[in-house]
């Protein structure tokens, strides 16, 4: 390319050949021949100028001709690479399937955990829940333990979302193991619209829950509908199992607290699991 910029070639470019399509080398030579004469260029004859032009033309064509370009390598031309990618895609799909299945299973387990745990606590008395579902013959044949007096305290709470008045009718009563007792809670709806509430409960100390038995299902875990300004009494019929007096862990326990909490029943609302607060 250095020959193109000798004084003679600059003269050709200055005279306007640069802006005219040269066509074939012969035609280009005819156009620039008057300017390549020795008296015009001072760098040699027309033959030398044609050699420069031919050299420039060949270089230009060589740089642009597709046949002279190095072959391009197509992506994914390696069959082993394609096979590996297909294997990776298959593994990723399998992993995503497993993850989705685990997520769905965990979601279903979370919805079933509350009722299952509630049933377990009511059956075993663990987690501070009273034991429910006892045969009447056991109640009739119980022998009260007269020398062991237990104080039962009652507590009532209302969640902030529920505008109810809820309180126990009695703050405390005294019972002995093997003796039945009846207590009442009172709830009132002071608003001007019907409200549905649902309650949960727990017992303190937690270890005493397995001895606190409800003779019949109380109002807990069931929806309670109160119309505007309606007020109702809610009974709790229970007894302390006589085995309470034989448990070494209960030797120093002379106070048991039964606590209820009411929540507004709404679609998608989950009750707290009965037990530890």
Curated annotation (Swiss-Prot):
Keyword flag Transmembrane helix: yes
Gene3D superfamilies named in the record: Ctag/Cox11
InterPro entries: CtaG/Cox11_dom_sf, Cyt_c_oxidase_assmbl_CtaG
Taxonomic superkingdom: Eukaryota
Main localization of the protein described in the UniProt heading: mitochondrion
Mitochondrial intermembrane topological segments: 118-277
Record-stated family: Belongs to the COX11/CtaG family.
Xref: HAMAP family: CtaG
Name this protein carries in UniProt: Cytochrome c oxidase assembly protein COX11, mitochondrial
Organism for this UniProt entry: Pongo abelii (Sumatran orangutan)
